[in-house]
């Protein structure tokens, strides 16, 4: 494929193995944007963990201060009553129990997040083969099993992201859009990293945040110099 002068310049701007200050990295990402749609900004974080060991698995959620820039559809399993009303008031797209489960079994799975109250898990448990492979199974570790579904819905709609270290010990997460202000992307990344530090497994030894790289949907990966971030 023939490269344009602009694309060649972008490729030359990113030196393999070099770490860039966060401000410069964001500018490179925005310069590299080439899709006809507004690209997402993704982060890949290599952790110093051995996920084969049960005490070194990392899973959690972060409420990004500037949101994700994405409209999120949320379904909530909760018995009828005040909590169901709270979930609807917070913007839930669907609320129910057995009736909602039946709709999902019939193919209505167009949701980004599924939330449940603890007493609704008896219903949700039957949907494991549907929700599990899609990453939608409610889990207390990421705030999707909650006694306060209204607050959980509000968080999901406001830009809460959920993540889990993969087999290689890498966290993949969206932290916004290239259309975001530079400062918004920076704050989102820092919030995510601070939360990851908080849930560092005690069994993890050595450097925990080994490598942090940003990329846009269609752009190159840019390694971040962590000393340019505020992680306190």
Curated annotation (Swiss-Prot):
Source organism (scientific name): Xylella fastidiosa (strain M12)
Record has Acyltransferase as a keyword: no
Subunit description: Part of the 50S ribosomal subunit.
Lineage, highest ranks first: Bacteria, Pseudomonadati, Pseudomonadota, Gammaproteobacteria, Lysobacterales
Keyword list, A-Z: Repressor, Ribonucleoprotein, Ribosomal protein, RNA-binding, rRNA-binding, Translation regulation, tRNA-binding
GO cellular component entries: cytosolic large ribosomal subunit
Role description: Binds directly to 23S rRNA. The L1 stalk is quite mobile in the ribosome, and is involved in E site tRNA release.
Gene symbol of the encoding locus: rplA
InterPro entries assigned to the protein according to its UniProt record, in alphabetical order: Ribosom_uL1_bac-type (IPR005878), Ribosomal_uL1 (IPR002143), Ribosomal_uL1-like (IPR023674), Ribosomal_uL1/biogenesis (IPR028364), Ribosomal_uL1_3-a/b-sand (IPR016095), Ribosomal_uL1_CS (IPR023673)
Pfam families: Ribosomal_L1
Annotated coiled-coil segments of the chain: none
GO molecular function per UniProt: rRNA binding; structural constituent of ribosome; tRNA binding
HAMAP family reported for this sequence: Ribosomal_uL1_B
GO BP terms: regulation of translation; translation
Stated name of the protein: Large ribosomal subunit protein uL1
Claim: Magnesium is one of the keywords in the record: no
Record family assignment: Belongs to the universal ribosomal protein uL1 family.
